[in-house]
Amino acid sequence: MLRIAIAKGRLMDSLINYLDAIEFTTLSETLKNRERQLLLSVDNIECILVKGSDVPIYVEQGIADIGIVGSDILDERHYNVNNLLDMPFGACHFAVAAKPETTNYRKIATSYVHTAEAYFKSKGIDVELIKLNGSVELACVVDMVDGIVDIVQTGTTLEANGLVEKQHISDINARLITNKAAYFKKSQLIEQFIRSLEVSIANA
């Protein structure tokens, strides 16, 4: 049995679409029909559905053998895992966003402090970072901050809140990671899973 930690939400939706496209229907249908279950089984695969930021922790601790998570999570801090494969889905990017008229930044709200700090430091801009755990757009709308650093996929949320993308920081995609011990103990299962994805990609 191979246990996979999968990030809930936007990334899992992208994963399901990808699995449908490559006709990995047993797994995609299991994920679609999950209802409120957080632990699912199909064939020799067991899926645990967790918050994105928790995926590498479950993998690092050996609860999951492999994980599918956004590179944004992995870029925020170091995890003792193997980063095996870039996945061809879940594409989006980090960006600085603000009101259209904003040109100077003194305060920035973000859930991604490390990424924001590294970016503004590289530009020689001294900013105060305010860490929020969600809805960072609101902080800019009510003028608590001058701008935000957040993940942008379509830009719809920014537009709905009267904000615009000011600078593109870096690209994000889904990645497949493994527990270091499991990579050896379950190498055959892991390689079989990866190989099936690669074959599907080649045939797409």
UniProtKB/Swiss-Prot annotation:
Alphabetically sorted, this entry's keywords are: Amino-acid biosynthesis, ATP-binding, Cytoplasm, Glycosyltransferase, Histidine biosynthesis, Nucleotide-binding, Transferase
Q: Which InterPro entries match?
A: ATP_PRibTrfase_cat, ATP_PRibTrfase_HisG, ATP_PRibTrfase_HisG_short
Highest taxon, organism lineage: Bacteria
Q: In Gene Ontology terms, what is a biological process of this protein?
A: L-histidine biosynthetic process
* UniProt organism field: Staphylococcus aureus (strain bovine RF122 / ET3-1)
Q: Which Pfam families match?
A: HisG
**Can you tell me which family this protein belongs to?**
Belongs to the ATP phosphoribosyltransferase family. Short subfamily.
Q: What is its EC number?
A: 2.4.2.17
Q: Reaction(s) catalyzed by this protein?
A: 1-(5-phospho-beta-D-ribosyl)-ATP + diphosphate = 5-phospho-alpha-D-ribose 1-diphosphate + ATP
Q: NCBIfam families, alphabetically?
A: hisG
- What GO cellular component term, any one, is given? cytoplasm
Q: Sum up the protein's function in the record's words.
A: Catalyzes the condensation of ATP and 5-phosphoribose 1-diphosphate to form N'-(5'-phosphoribosyl)-ATP (PR-ATP). Has a crucial role in the pathway because the rate of histidine biosynthesis seems to be controlled primarily by regulation of HisG enzymatic activity.
Location(s) in or outside the cell: Cytoplasm
- Name the record gives this protein: ATP phosphoribosyltransferase
Pathway info: Amino-acid biosynthesis; L-histidine biosynthesis; L-histidine from 5-phospho-alpha-D-ribose 1-diphosphate: step 1/9
Task: Report the enzyme's class at the first EC level.
Answer: transferase
This protein's gene is called hisG
**One example GO MF annotation:** ATP phosphoribosyltransferase activity
